Amino acid sequence: MKFNVLSLFAPWAKMDERNFKDQEKEDLVSITAPKLDDGAREFEVSSNEAASPYNAAFQTIFGSYEPGMKTTRELIDTYRNLMNNYEVDNAVSEIVSDAIVYEDDTEVVALNLDKSKFSPKIKNMMLDEFSDVLNHLSFQRKGSDHFRRWYVDSRIFFHKIIDPKRPKEGIKELRRLDPRQVQYVREIITETEAGTKIVKGYKEYFIYDTAHESYACDGRMYEAGTKIKIPKAAVVYAHSGLVDCCGKNIIGYLHRAVKPANQLKLLEDAVVIYRITRAPDRRVWYVDTGNMPARKAAEHMQHVMNTMKNRVVYDASTGKIKNQQHNMSMTEDYWLQRRDGKAVTEVDTLPGADNTGNMEDIRWFRQALYMALRVPLSRIPQDQQGGVMFDSGTSITRDELTFAKFIRELQHKFEEVFLDPLKTNLLLKGIITEDEWNDEINNIKIEFHRDSYFAELKEAEILERRINMLTMAEPFIGKYISHRTAMKDILQMTDEEIEQEAKQIEEESKEARFQDPDQEQEDF
């Protein structure tokens, strides 16, 4: 698809075109397109149509019918509406606070290049560029906000803004885009060989819908609802990695919680309604209409009802009791006719319910919500408002260990927010080449800071267990197993650590303060 590209995207368009030419040179032909599970809308375009500005992809994307964008917009709106439920918000806050940890004098996230083969000079330059990326994201202050948006929306986009005249200066700003207005597109370029379609390559880009905004660029005025093609290299894109059953749309981690969250909210509202309607004694009016004709009796009933009417309604959106139209009825009197002079008009009461203290249903749905979000049930706020008991980490449950693994999985998928702009800066400034980056990408590690208190508890517990094992094995050390084996297998020390500790022990043995006091008295 070829049409005018805005001047601010020109450097990125050249970069994408260069990558596509490199792809053509490799001549990697297949019978199927790559399955990347990244939510891109794929269009099959022949090699001849790829050069046409009005191919099938153009007509589909720029037409009035956009099922893909509508589905994405509805999904994100659904996830955001869930956050209005305080139960969902509390559970998501547990996930975000474990993934992004703020502590004094520590970096929220750091770059580890220890296993990479870059020279020390290159490593220092990469660390400086990584700091610039964090500054552009304001991650030290807004890291949890970025992670929360990514988790809730299931995706996050940043526009990499550079100076088109001086691209070697790198990224100037990372500007977040509305994920509901961005669409990821992949054109699959095919050729026909012996009646069979062969995939020759693919092109990727983003389509941004300006929605209700209008803007001016390159001396032209663009009205609201304009669709803009953005080169893939100009956008940072990180997604959840989860796809729906058809494998075409990205869904969020909140997708599993939609049903239990709505059921919990419905049940909580139903409990309020039930308690207000059944807890108080309701009035029962027996209106004596005597031998009145049916029409007169109905008019008399209506007159008494309008005079003595008592109606209370409950607004589920605010949780308030009020009396307005279009609200769910709560308490209302019963009105019954009496004839033939059996009794005069009287007011009686209907006893209220006596089982309104049962909350087991709400607790069950709350547990279902936390299980859907993979948050340990031990983190559900308890009715007693009790605190958390710490006992040197010995009470760490399997759920907490599973939750820690889940947090690491989320952090790993969120890493693209740092790696993509870092790679862009390194390439624009000529610090490394793209081949060097691809060769070392598996050795470039993003380390998220963990809660130091729990980390220390875990390390102390592990060390305590190793020392206890060493104490039990002490009678056999030197007889059945060697000291070196005990240090490596029981204390889990490496060869370097063993040599280092041996030298340190030898040096300390020469200092008086580290010698045995009893031995010193004997020598004296």
From Swiss-Prot:
Biased composition (Basic and acidic residues): 500-516
Function noted in UniProt: Forms the portal vertex of the capsid. This portal plays critical roles in head assembly, genome packaging, neck/tail attachment, and genome ejection. The portal protein multimerizes as a single ring-shaped homododecamer arranged around a central channel. Binds to the terminase subunits to form the packaging machine. Attaches to the host inner membrane most likely through interaction with host yidC and forms together with chaperone gp40 an initiator complex to form the prohead.
Organism: Enterobacteria phage T4
InterPro entries: Portal_Gp20 (IPR010823)
Gene assigned in the entry: 20
GO biological process, one term: symbiont genome ejection through host cell envelope, contractile tail mechanism
Stretches for region Disordered: 500-524
Protein name: Portal protein
Residue ranges the record marks as coiled coil: 486-516
Similarity comment: family membership: Belongs to the Tevenvirinae portal protein family.
Compartments reported by the entry: Virion; Host cell inner membrane
Keywords from the named record: Capsid protein, Coiled coil, Host cell inner membrane, Host cell membrane, Host membrane, Membrane, Viral capsid assembly, Viral contractile tail ejection system, Viral genome ejection through host cell envelope, Viral genome packaging, Viral penetration into host cytoplasm, Viral release from host cell, Virion, Virus entry into host cell
Quaternary structure and partners: Homododecamer. Interacts with the large terminase subunit. Interacts with the major capsid protein. Interacts with the capsid vertex protein.
Gene Ontology, cellular component aspect: host cell plasma membrane; membrane; viral portal complex
Disulfide bond positions: none
Pfam families to which the protein is assigned, alphabetical: Portal_T4
